[in-house]
Design a protein with these regions (language model features):
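Metal-dependent phosphoester/phosphodiester hydrolase catalytic core
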Residues: 1-197
Length: 197
């Protein structure tokens, strides 16, 4: 499994800036690096690529929003890149929403004309008040504090991995579960298969 972490603050254009091809959450250098990392992970045959994305990917377009909804041109650019380069085994661990949620790809496809659904996982908040940010999410949303997410990856050395995401609330236990598998990108149209929710 290949984990890729990005910084969406230090090189970002203000969310209040007018939408354009130059408006960016990543900045030019990091975006080029990120795209190359996706290609490298695909070409290396990793069964799963996990993007640790500090901000919610799923969100309606809204100028000034701090999620990817405030940078829709760049989000579409990245989604088109993911689709065009057959990065079919990408899952996102997203931050900056104070709640538990997951999406199985139903609401996460921002490529022009479709073709780039990704699994999105949210596991928070430890101490902050609960809130819902972005969405909708196919697995629902559980806002609140004293929560966390666990992504378990089972690898038997074969060409695929099995994954289970569990959203937990301290004192109450499991609030949501999403089980999926990942196979090397390019091996099929959708290398992430949803097993159960």
């Amino acid at each position: 499994v290949r984990f890729i972490m990005t910084d969406l603050r230090s090189g970002a254009t203000a969310a209040t800036a007018k939408e354009s091809a130059s408006k960016s959450k990543m900045g030019t250098a990091q975006k080029a690096w990120f795209k190359q990392e996706l290609i490298n992970a695909r070409d290396s045959g990793f069964p799963l690529i996990v993007w640790v994305c500090p901000d919610p990917w799923i969100a309606p377009a809204q100028l000034g929003d701090d999620s990817w909804g405030g940078h829709v041109t760049e989000r579409t650019e990245l989604a088109n890149f993911i689709r065009d380069n057959r990065i079919t085994n990408l899952a996102l661990i997203s931050g900056d929403m104070h709640g538990l949620a997951f999406d199985d790809g139903t609401h996460s496809d921002y490529a022009t004309g479709g073709g780039a659904p990704v699994t999105v996982l949210h596991g928070a908040a430890r101490t902050s008040d609960g809130s819902t940010k972005g969405g909708p999410y196919s697995g629902g949303v559980f806002p609140g504090n004293m929560q966390y997410g666990v992504l378990e990856i089972y690898d038997n050395g074969g060409p695929s991995v099995a994954c289970r995401f569990v959203g937990m609330k301290v004192g109450e236990g499991r609030k949501l579960t999403h089980i999926f598998s990942g196979s090397p990108a390019g091996s099929k149209d959708h290398a992430i298969v949803n097993i159960s929710t």
